[in-house]
Amino acid sequence: IPEVPIVTHEIGQYETYPNFKEIEKYTGSLKARNFEVFRERLDEKGLLPLAEDYFKCSGKLAVQCYKEEMEAVFRSRLLGGFQILDIQDFSGQGTALVGVLDAFMDSKGLITDSEWREFCNDAVVMARFDSYVLEAGSSFKAHTELCNYRPDLKDGKLICTLTLENGDVIGKVEKNFIAEGNYTDICDVEFTLPQVTKNTKAVLALEIEGTDIRNHYDLWVIP
């Protein structure tokens, strides 16, 4: 265990596909020539109609990767913190589309600010589990924990709910806890998944009652 704090440097840097609608924002001396070249190449391959899908899908994947990596840091007892390159795209050296904001600090529409704060904040509640893809009728197990840098948060109540996309609640667990420094193991939860006839989305939602501390995980239940 290190005796001095270790802070990770520029973690993440997950790329998103270019959003060609951004080209029209460059109204001054700086032009998005790189985006224009990318668009031209895509058009030559007959794939330009898929550009919007490429942008949205790659963006959602990048957001999920950032969430996974930041939560890994928050769960670690051996790291003192982390630094990401930026939450906006970096256009200073070539093309680095690594942000959830574009080069103009505008949202790309991939995630809201409140959703980002679920896993990037001074207090983050999290769940550990083996897989995001679950078999119908099986048992889903998760461990819940809190990374807390709020001096006024001494205790609280965790509310953990697993819900299907149609609103049906599979199960709910409430657990009081005492905050133990910066890291608190709250409890283990277990839910029996229902039988389904098609791939079905489920959401594992966590919140600390009476606070803005919350998080959620999108899961898939398969027949």
Enumerate the language-model features and the residues they cover.
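Substrate-binding clefts and catalytic carboxylate motifs of secreted carbohydrate-active enzymes
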Residues: 1-164, 170, 181
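A general secondary-structure boundary signal
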Residues: 188, 205-207, 218
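Hydrophobic beta-strand positions in extracellular immunoglobulin-like domains
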Residues: 146, 162, 191-193, 208
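Short, aromatic- and glycine-rich surface loops/edge beta-strands on solvent-exposed regions
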Residues: 199-210
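Short beta-strand elements
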Residues: 178, 211-223
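Intrinsically disordered, low-complexity Pro/Gly/Ser/Thr-rich segments with frequent PxxP/GP/PP motifs
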Residues: 168-197
